[in-house]
């Protein structure tokens, strides 16, 4: 997997670009592998601004069965040196510094929207593909930068219809491909770790990083304290990686007291927090607006949601997932609320079934192959004679 490896009769160059932390790679790396296998005449490179991401990608590619892809670390090194611990190098400066190199590709595939800025930095020839990095309901991802992309992926009809109806993406530039991350998880088959000495039902608490939307600032420490004071449940605290940027919990004042609590496991950004290990092993999902709830619902189970901002959420498509379980409107006895969510799960099962079906189109070929074929079609149009 040498980024400089030659390919005979190359008919195109495709870059899969990663300028954030490792969690975003799982949404497209399997499509890169599938494309390289489908089209050995196409140069497929995975480019990242973080050496940690390059190492992680190499492991994942091996787990997927290897493929003729290149791995390339983007510079400059001095700009990487300005990166805070656990974070990613500044995205816009890195894009500006690498615009000339990236502009040499026919297609640039990215899991996040900041890559649209390449158009500002003079990249005109290369076509841009946005894969998404989640399939949630939050309104933030549905925004004008989508118009900069030549092709946008959707996991299913929900995402596609919302983007098209908002006028952000023409229907012909939107490809419904399913959810390639599921293919990666199935290939990795992470073994559930033994986290707790006592076997109890497991709750995964997964707050979002955005303080304007997430439950952590107002309610998070109190929730951890409540679980530390009971003995009926084990709790995995696995927030979005950007909430604490992968810090050591001992260095976070609001978390240090819970580090040695036998019924609480803290993970602020390890591999198990991004490869669905925790959402697969948990019995109950506790969260706010993270798209990970849909990954959890690959197997339908009880959910409980936290409205710490007292938003009027009913009927708002950005909160559709809050119809999949009870919503806590005022923090009281959170353990009793979990009990109630488990006991009343049957009432929410139809909404979970419908919501999952609208979110993920998993029919036909694997999601990774469908994504690769969509990129291949874009490449073929680019190189069509005349």
Question: Predicted segment positions?
Answer:
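Nucleotide-activated donor-dependent transferases that construct or modify glycoconjugates
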Residues: 3-22, 204-205
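Structural loop-to-beta junction motif characteristic of Rossmann-like glycosyltransferase folds
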Residues: 126, 284, 300-304
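Catalytic binding pocket for nucleotide-activated donors in carbohydrate/polymer assembly enzymes
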Residues: 171, 291-359
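Donor nucleotide-activated moiety binding/catalytic core segment of transferases
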Residues: 249-294
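Catalytic cores of nucleotide-enabled group-transfer and carboxylate-activating enzymes in metabolic
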Residues: 140, 160, 276, 280, ...
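C-terminal amphipathic helix plus adjacent low-complexity
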Residues: 340-386
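Conserved catalytic-core segment of nucleotide-activated headgroup transferases in glycan assembly
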Residues: 24-39, 43, 182-255, 326, ...
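Active-site and donor-binding regions of nucleotide-sugar-utilizing enzymes
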Residues: 19-38, 45-186
């Amino acid at each position: 997997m040498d980024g400089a490896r030659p390919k005979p009769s190359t008919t195109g160059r495709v870059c899969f670009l990663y300028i954030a932390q490792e969690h975003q790679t799982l949404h497209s790396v399997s499509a890169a592998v599938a494309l390289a296998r489908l089209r050995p005449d196409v140069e497929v490179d995975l480019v990242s601004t973080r050496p940690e991401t390059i190492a992680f990608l190499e492991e994942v590619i091996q787990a997927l069965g290897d493929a003729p892809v290149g791995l390339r670390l983007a510079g400059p090194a001095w700009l990487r040196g300005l990166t805070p611990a656990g974070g990613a190098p500044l995205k816009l400066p890195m894009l500006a510094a690498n615009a000339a190199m990236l502009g040499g590709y026919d297609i640039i595939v990215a899991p996040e929207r900041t890559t649209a800025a390449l158009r500002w930095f003079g990249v005109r020839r290369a076509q841009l593909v946005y894969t998404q990095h989640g399939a949630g309901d939050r309104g933030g991802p549905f925004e004008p930068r989508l118009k900069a992309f030549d092709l946008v992926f959707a996991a299913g009809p929900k995402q596609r219809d919302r983007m098209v109806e908002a006028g952000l993406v023409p229907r012909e530039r939107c490809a419904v491909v399913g959810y390639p991350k599921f293919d990666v998880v199935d290939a990795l088959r992470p073994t559930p770790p033994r986290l707790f000495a006592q076997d109890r039902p497991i709750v995964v608490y997964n707050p979002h990083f955005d303080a304007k939307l997430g439950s952590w600032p107002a309610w998070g420490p109190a929730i951890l304290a409540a679980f530390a004071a009971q003995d009926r449940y084990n709790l995995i605290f696995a927030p979005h990686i950007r909430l604490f940027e992968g810090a050591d919990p001992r260095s976070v004042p609001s978390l240090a007291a819970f580090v040695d609590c036998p019924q609480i496991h803290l993970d602020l950004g390890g591999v198990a927090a991004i490869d669905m290990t925790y959402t697969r092993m948990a019995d109950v999902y506790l969260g706010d607006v993270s798209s990970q709830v849909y990954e959890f619902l690959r197997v339908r189970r009880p959910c409980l949601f936290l409205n710490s901002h007292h938003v009027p959420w009913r009927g708002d498509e950005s909160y559709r997932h809050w119809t999949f379980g009870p919503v806590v409107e005022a923090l009281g006895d959170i353990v009793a609320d979990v009990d109630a969510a488990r006991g009343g799960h049957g009432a929410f099962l139809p909404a979970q079934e419908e919501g999952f079906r609208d979110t993920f189109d998993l029919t036909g070929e694997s999601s990774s192959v469908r994504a690769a074929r969509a990129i291949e079609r874009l490449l073929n149009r680019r190189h069509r004679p005349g």
